[in-house]
Amino acid sequence: MKYEVFARIRAGDELIHVGNVDAPDDRLVKSYARTTFDEEDWDRMVAVPRDELIEVTGNQKAESPPRSTQ
């Protein structure tokens, strides 16, 4: 399953998207995310299953680019 990972460096800062990881379940995503994004001493890190993200703007499906008329 694909997870989107968000983190912050200091308490009180906003969470920022730091990337994504593939993990078989919620338990292992914690270890995978910590290992993958270990370049900072994060105050907080959260992982959200990509399928659980709610579309706020835009289309659900990516649109095809316009075709050339030439």
Region locations from a protein language model:
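Residues in well-ordered beta-strands of folded domains
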Residues: F6, D22, V48
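Short amphipathic, charge-patterned alpha-helical segments
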Residues: L28-T35
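Short aromatic-glycine-(Arg/Gly/Cys) micro-motifs in beta-strand/loop hairpins
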Residues: M1-I16
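Short, mixed-charge low-complexity intrinsically disordered segments
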Residues: T35-Q70
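A short, exposed loop/beta-hairpin motif centered on an aromatic-Gly-Thr core
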Residues: I16-P24
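Short acidic, gly/pro-rich beta-turn/loop elements at beta-sheet edges
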Residues: L15, S31, E55-T57
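Compositionally biased, intrinsically disordered low-complexity segments
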Residues: G12, V21, T57-N59
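Short, charged/polar surface micro-motifs in flexible loops or helix N-caps
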Residues: D26-R27, L53
